[in-house]
UniProtKB/Swiss-Prot annotation:
Motif mapping: 'HIGH' region: 127-137
Catalytic activity, reaction form: tRNA(Arg) + L-arginine + ATP = L-arginyl-tRNA(Arg) + AMP + diphosphate
Segments passing through the bilayer: none
Protein name as annotated: Arginine--tRNA ligase
Pfam families: Arg_tRNA_synt_N (PF03485), DALR_1 (PF05746), tRNA-synt_1d (PF00750)
Family: Belongs to the class-I aminoacyl-tRNA synthetase family.
HAMAP family, per database record: Arg_tRNA_synth
Disulfide linkage: none
EC number: 6.1.1.19
Lineage, highest ranks first: Bacteria, Pseudomonadati, Pseudomonadota, Gammaproteobacteria, Pseudomonadales
UniProt superkingdom: Bacteria
Keywords on record: Aminoacyl-tRNA synthetase, ATP-binding, Cytoplasm, Ligase, Nucleotide-binding, Protein biosynthesis
GO molecular function terms listed in the Swiss-Prot or TrEMBL record: arginine-tRNA ligase activity; ATP binding
Amino acid sequence: MKDTIRQLIQQALTQLVTDGVLPEGLSPAIQVENARDKTHGDFASNIAMMLAKPAGMKPRDLAEKLINALPASADISKVEIAGPGFLNFFQNTDALANRLDAALADAHLGARKAGPAQKVVIDMSAPNLAKEMHVGHLRSTIIGDSVARVLEFLGDNVIRQNHVGDWGTQFGMLMAYLQENPITSDELSDLENFYRAAKKRFDESEEFATRARGLVVKLQAGDPECLALWTRFKDISLSHCQKTYELLNVKLTMADVMGESAYNDDLANVVADLKAKGLLVEDQGAQCVFLDEFKNSEGDPLPVIVQKADGGYLYATTDLAAVRYRSNVLKADRALYFVDQRQALHFNQVFEVARRAGFVGHPMQMEHMGFGTMNGADGRPFKTRDGGTVKLIDLLTEAKERAYALVKEKNPSLADDELRHIGEVVGIGAVKYADLSKHRTSDYSFNFELMLNFEGNTAPYLLYAYTRVAGVFRKLGKGFDEVDGKIVLHAAHEQDLAARLAQFGEILNNVAEKGTPHVLCSYLYDLAGLFSSFYENCPILAAETPSQQQSRLRLAALTGRTLKQGLELLGLETLERM
């Protein structure tokens, strides 16, 4: 609806320019917001106040001319001026009801992408395969997954790329330690302890470190024995990752893995091509690109090092090769990198070097979707009691157990299998939702007590809200798609719920554009609250007439489907009862 209003305002502005009321060359960002007071309309715009000065008019006078120039629309019943010059738009409830009836008959609930479909690469998760996934991998994995789901739902062709760390000195270290300490595959499955022991040897023994580096050289040269050991490590680590992805209900598979090693053959070409473009400068033996846009505190350009003095390559080299592959081979229109906010400088440099070098042959928009850190309840980095890294699988297991105990306490009569299933859905959902509901760029503190609360903006609350809607239809023995009739909006609570339901597509487009799942979380929480008010004030099963009951059932059905679909787009499973 906001897009419709923006289009109407734009047409009015064009007319006022033609009439000489407004000067040519204006290109204002037309803002349309939800009205705070529904008695003054459903939507409001401050466009008249924005353009009053260039028009040489008082805001209210310009607002009046804008209203007169607005094209007629079946979606708008009237437009009024409020305060210093706000335009308040009142939605036509009959048109709104028709939109919701159409949404109920649509698999996509009326949501359509604002713009043409695109091919989008999502760079997400990217764990270091030398050790197990830890809590620091959670945000990239689940935020990337949610945005990928939303883009696919809106019609984009999404290519997930799990840029795992599967190359480098760390693997030489592991191979050297394995040569010293032959162990079984079962023992090797505990990668964390194996890595810790190998790292200790690497730090304490120069002879061991030299041997480890030598094994890396042999690995890079394609030595069969080293490749076999490397493949063994990689397969074990990827199997660990896959179990975690499945528990998280994340749509990542082995087919999505495109690790650092995949670009090895192109790294020398990257350096050669940068040199051919005249972009390389040798600095202390290293090959660097200097960009004037990026300077240090002393005002000197910062180097983007693509090859060390010893001939080794760096993350920037691999990332440049990945950019070229994603643009020229995958032919992506967008590439979204869900990587820690602290890597912003690195990616801004890589993107600019790629553009300068002509690596982006197919026009591709590159965006670093940075995120903040997850801290402990004390606001400090999330660690175990002894200061170690918290394994992600351990955190998720604890979440399941805590949720199971909570659900068992509330529903002791349920069978244990059902309690376990509910516990897993609630526990995993709670961890994911607590993260996704925060702004992507914000840091947040992890707190089991808050995220497992059945009140407030939490997964348990939303999961319960969905079961409440499902319960209405279970009593009637109907599904959400088995309600005839038409939606008719009379009561204020019906209209409030209907207006919010109609915004689902707009919310999804916001998430798709900005990579911000918290917007969808806020929407679902608000929707659940509006349904609760509607349910309490507008009797469904005890409606006054059959047509009123059908109308309210249809509103409830669309609410249920929207909640379920929204939670699914966040990567959360739903329950029919709790």
